[in-house]
Amino acid sequence: MNRPYNFSAGPAAIPAEVLQQAASEMLDWHGSGMGVMEMSHRGKEFISIYEQAEADLRELLAVPQDFRILFMQGGGLAENAIVPLNLSRAATVDMVVTGSWSQKSLKEARKYASEVHVAASAEDSGFTTLPDPASWQLSRGASYLHLCSNETIHGIEFHELPDLRALGSDAPLVIDFSSHVASRPVDWSRVGLAFGGAQKNLGPAGLTLVVVREDLLGHALPACPSAFDYKVVAENQSMFNTPPTWGIYIAGLTFQWLKRQREGDLSGIAAMEQRNIAKARLLYNFIDQSQFYVNKVSPNARSRMNIPFFLRDETRNEAFLAGARERGLLQLKGHKSVGGMRASLYNAMPLAGVEALVAYMQEFEQRSA
């Protein structure tokens, strides 16, 4: 079966091998007589799924032993509230605002933190650039600094995480890596907490990944619900309440798929990074040489995962989308807040899918000349 290429920003494409394995195990997981959705989360069958998923993720992302991996619920949007509920007790919260998602983070932090300070913003550029870390106005003794390391809507990415200590701050760095998790390595020496919804690169909607340094546990505000208290969740191995069992299972299969990936001598996340660089380069290079399409983001800030682009003649938008659907190129419409088109090139998108998109874009440009 030749499946269409799904460029959705999330929920997004899941590797076909993962879907096929899940389908084969739907009625009977490993001879248990049960599907995973039917299992008790405290039964030995699901415990083995959970433990393997956690171990595989720790290996893939090279998560240090002094970090805890939590499988939670609520998505990245809920984490924008859960983070300040856990970390904002001491002092000011610093925020770097680079697009729609960090704007949402700012709004939520202001509900719970006693003081929120915008250390830097790219709003004046229309969210087409990244503020130079050397220019950030960092607060003394901040509880944490939050940034969205990949802005899904505006297509902006920090390819290198800032070193806050080198900038004179002892604040832990909190990153929302929802839309680039597992697409590239993470420098954990620069991170205190990372969170992300699973529905872009890890599996289905409903699962949220949190990776948090142990010294950041136990600082929740009194008003923080127990189910959102990172210390409580960690002490209960992500099972203080019933976890999203199906999401953890599919994520676990995705982790195993990632471990099998190879690019030359590279494997796992390193292989995926090289593959993702190649996919993004192919599409950006075509857009940049075109007289018909445009990407507005500064080259050094461009996301590898989410590539917005615009037709110079926007009256052709609907025709472009209709032709794409006819060719099996799905969900290319841009976010309603910015318009245009958006191609999301998550891990499950093969290079062949990007090649098919570029071929169609070239054909459409020629027909529209």
Curated annotation (Swiss-Prot):
This is Phosphoserine aminotransferase. Its main location: cytoplasm. The modification N6-(pyridoxal phosphate)lysine is found at residue 200. Pyridoxal 5'-phosphate binds at residues 101, 152, 176, 199, 241-242. NCBIfam families: PRK05355.1 (NF003764), serC_1 (TIGR01364). Belongs to the class-V pyridoxal-phosphate-dependent aminotransferase family. SerC subfamily. Keywords: Amino-acid biosynthesis, Aminotransferase, Cytoplasm, Pyridoxal phosphate, Pyridoxine biosynthesis, Serine biosynthesis, Transferase. It comes from Paracidovorax citrulli (strain AAC00-1). It catalyses: O-phospho-L-serine + 2-oxoglutarate = 3-phosphooxypyruvate + L-glutamate; 4-(phosphooxy)-L-threonine + 2-oxoglutarate = (R)-3-hydroxy-2-oxo-4-phosphooxybutanoate + L-glutamate. HAMAP family: SerC_aminotrans_5 (MF_00160). Binds 1 pyridoxal phosphate per subunit. Its EC number is 2.6.1.52. Homodimer. GO terms for molecular function: O-phospho-L-serine:2-oxoglutarate aminotransferase activity; pyridoxal phosphate binding. Pfam families: Aminotran_5 (PF00266). Catalyzes the reversible conversion of 3-phosphohydroxypyruvate to phosphoserine and of 3-hydroxy-2-oxo-4-phosphonooxybutanoate to phosphohydroxythreonine. The keyword Amino-acid biosynthesis applies. Pathway: Amino-acid biosynthesis; L-serine biosynthesis; L-serine from 3-phospho-D-glycerate: step 2/3; Cofactor biosynthesis; pyridoxine 5'-phosphate biosynthesis; pyridoxine 5'-phosphate from D-erythrose 4-phosphate: step 3/5. L-glutamate binds at residue 42. It is found in: Cytoplasm. GO terms for cellular component: cytoplasm. Its cofactor is pyridoxal 5'-phosphate.
